[in-house]
Amino acid sequence: MKNRSLTLRLISVLCLTALFVWLGSTLVAWWQVRHDVNKVFDAQQVLFAERLANSDLSTILLESSTTLNKNSQSVLKKSYDDDALAFAIFSKTGKLLFSDGRNGKDFIFNYKTGFYNANIYDDDDKWRIFWRMAANGELVIAVGQELDYREDLIEEMILGQMWIWFASLPILIIVLGWLIHKELRPIKRLSQEVQTRKSGDVSLLNTEGLPVEILPLVKNLNQFFDRTSAMLQRERRFTSDAAHELRSPLAALRIQIEVAQLAGDDVALREQALLHLTQGIDRASQLIEQLLTLSRLDNLQALETLQLLDWEAIVQSLISERYFVAEKRKITLVFEKESEPKQKQGQSILVSLMLRNLLDNAIKYCPEDTIVSVKISSSQIIIEDNGGGVEPEDLKKLGQRFYRPAGQNEKGSGLGLSIVMRIAELHGFKVRLENVVKEGRRIGLKAIISL
C-alpha cells in the first residue's frame, strides 16, 4: 500500500465527514422548513377565510342577487393585497359571487371543506386551496395559494444557508490544516530525532509533549533501546572479561610449550611441562565455558518452559554425582531434609547448575576431613561446610566477577558464584553468604538460598 500524508488524509476525511453531515443536516432542515412553512401558510389561509366569513361581505353578497362590480372588488382587494394568496366566494350552488379579480376567479368549485391540492382554470401549476362554509351554509369561501410560491420560498431559505456553508468551506479547510499541522508537530520532531540518530545511539527518546495515542509506541521503543543498551554493555563486558582473563592462561600455555621444546632429552621435564600444559588447557576451557554460560544467562530477560522443581531429587542427584570427587578429597557429603520445601517453578537444569557450583566450591576449597551438608527446609536451601570460612573483607566481595580471595591454592576463574547469583535472580530467589560462627570462632561458610 502506498504511503500517504497523514495531514492530507485527516483533512480529506474531516472535510468529507463535514460534507456528509452537512448534506444530512440540509435534508433534515429542508424537511423541517417545508413543514413549518406549510404550517404557517395553511394557518394564514384559514385566518384569511375566517376574516372573510366574519366580515360584512357575506351579508352584502347574500342580500344582493348579483356579483359585486369591479370597483367594489378593488376596494375590498386593497384591504388584503397579497400576491401570495387568492380567494373566491361561491354560492352554495357553485356560482362565483366574488373573487380577488385575479387567480381567485379561476378556482374550480368544490363543495367539500378543508384543504385540497388542485388545479385551477388555465393553469397547470398545483394550488393549495382551503374551502370553508359561511353564512349558515349559503356561501362557500375558498382561499388558495400556489404551491410553487411555497417551494420557491423554501428553496430560497435553504440556498441561503448552503451558500453560507460553501463560503466557509475554504476557511474550514485552512483552519483544519493549521490545527492538524500544529498537533502533528511533536510526531514530526520525533521522526527527525530518530532519522538524525547516529548508529549505535541507544539513548532514550524524549516523550515530552507527545500525544497520548503515540506515547505507548515511544515507550516501547525506549524499552527496546534499554534492552539493546544492556545487551551491548553485556557484550562489551564479555569481550573485555574474556580478553583480560584469557591473557594469563594463554601466556602460561605458551611458557609450558616453550619449556617442553627446550627440555631436550630431559624426559621428566618434558612430561611435567606437558602435564602443566594439559592442566592449563583444562582451566582455559573451563573459563571459556563459564564465560559463555554467564553471557547466555545475562542475555535472558525471563525464563521460559518452566516446570515444578523437585528439590529433593535435584539435591540427591548432585550428591550422587559429586560423591566420588568429595571422597577423593576426604570430604563427607550430608543431605538433611528438615521439612517439605515450597513448591516453585523454574528450569531444573539451571537450578541444578546453581547448586552444583555451590557444592563444587565447598568441595574444592574445604580442607580434608571436613563435612559439607545440604539442608532443605520449607523456605530455604542451605549448603554449609566446616572448612574455616573466609575473611570478612573477602566475604563482602564474593560473587563479584573474577574475584578470588588471595592465597587460594585451588585454581578457579571467579565466575562460579556470579553464575549462582544470576540464576537465582532469574528464578526470584535470594542468595546470601555467611560465615558459620560457633562460640565466637569462625568454623565454616554457608550459602543460604531463600525460596
Curated annotation (Swiss-Prot):
| Top enzyme class | transferase
Q: Tell me which UniProt keywords the record has, alphabetically.
A: ATP-binding, Cell inner membrane, Cell membrane, Kinase, Membrane, Nucleotide-binding, Phosphoprotein, Transferase, Transmembrane, Transmembrane helix, Two-component regulatory system
According to the entry, every stretch annotated as the Histidine kinase domain falls at 241-451
**Could you tell me what reaction this enzyme catalyses?**
ATP + protein L-histidine = ADP + protein N-phospho-L-histidine
Q: Name one GO biological process term.
A: phosphorelay signal transduction system
SUPFAM superfamilies referenced in this protein's UniProt entry, alphabetically:
ATPase domain of HSP90 chaperone/DNA topoisomerase II/histidine kinase, Homodimeric domain of signal transducing histidine kinase
Modification sites for Phosphohistidine: 244
| SMART domains linked | HATPase_c, HisKA
Q: Which domain of life is it from?
A: Bacteria
Question: Where do the TM regions start and end?
Answer: 10-31, 163-180
Q: Which PROSITE patterns match?
A: HAMP (PS50885), HIS_KIN (PS50109)
Concerning Pfam families, the annotation shows:
2CSK_N, HATPase_c, HisKA
Show where the HAMP domain sits. 181-233
Q: Where in the cell is it found?
A: Cell inner membrane
Q: Which residues lie on this side of the membrane: Cytoplasmic?
A: 1-9, 181-451
How the protein sits in the membrane? Multi-pass membrane protein
Periplasmic side, ranges: 32-162
Which E.C. number(s) belong to this protein? Answer: 2.7.13.3
InterPro entries on file:
2CSK_N, HAMP_dom, HATPase_C_sf, His_kinase_dom, HisK_dim/P_dom, HisK_dim/P_sf, Sig_transdc_His_kin-like_C, TCS_sensor_his_kinase
List the GO terms this entry assigns under cellular component, sorted alphabetically.
plasma membrane
Annotated function: Member of a two-component regulatory system QseB/QseC. May activate QseB by phosphorylation.
Its name, as the record gives it, is: Sensor protein QseC
Organism of this sequence: Haemophilus influenzae (strain ATCC 51907 / DSM 11121 / KW20 / Rd)
Lineage start: Bacteria, Pseudomonadati, Pseudomonadota, Gammaproteobacteria, Pasteurellales
